[in-house]
């Protein structure tokens, strides 16, 4: 049962709160997007502990780390269980909800067509923006600019020695791709291209001209931001 503290230390049930203040009722009346992160988490928790109601407990969990709601993804079930009021049942519900959201975000529709740099960043943003290591990816396109496949070329600190043209073009040749968009993430969140980023791009473009498979863009993904070499007329 969820409780809300009164100023004189007695408690009232959340069901006795004004309807517009209750997370479930608020969601039904105004839509799920009207809820704060704490209210969404409170719906999963359902109850609080002896000192906090569900919303207060949700706020406490979110504010335990500077990353806010995002740090829940890195927490284990055991770590969640160590929080007062969070047992095995609530911990598994939280982790299941996070995984479901992650799978929805990473779902890739078949034959997704790329019309501009915004399309490609939208397609890959959620799967790359939170990674703690740099991942260099080659996205393979057909003649209609539809995604055929993608391949992780390297994982780790980006350098021309790790991003070898052979690995970029090998799968493209096998899949009969006509174009390639290369992309990688910056774990720092910044999307400013480094000198190494530019050198790698130039090298791949030259190789593509020889092979006959065009590198049409290089996208850098940051924390909700992106940088397109094509949009910025670097290529």
From Swiss-Prot:
Sites where the protein binds Zn(2+): 184, 186, 197
GO process annotations (BP): proteolysis
CDD domains, A to Z: MPN_DUF2466 (cd08071)
Annotated motif JAMM motif, positions: 184-197
Superkingdom of the organism of origin: Bacteria
Keywords of the record: Hydrolase, Metal-binding, Metalloprotease, Protease, Zinc
InterPro entries linked: MPN, RadC_JAB, UPF0758, UPF0758_CS, UPF0758_N
UniProt domain MPN: residue ranges: 113-235
GO molecular function: metal ion binding; metallopeptidase activity
Family: Belongs to the UPF0758 family.
PANTHER family per record: DNA REPAIR PROTEIN RADC (PTHR30471), UPF0758 PROTEIN YEES-RELATED (PTHR30471:SF3)
Name the UniProt record assigns to this protein: UPF0758 protein CD630_11440
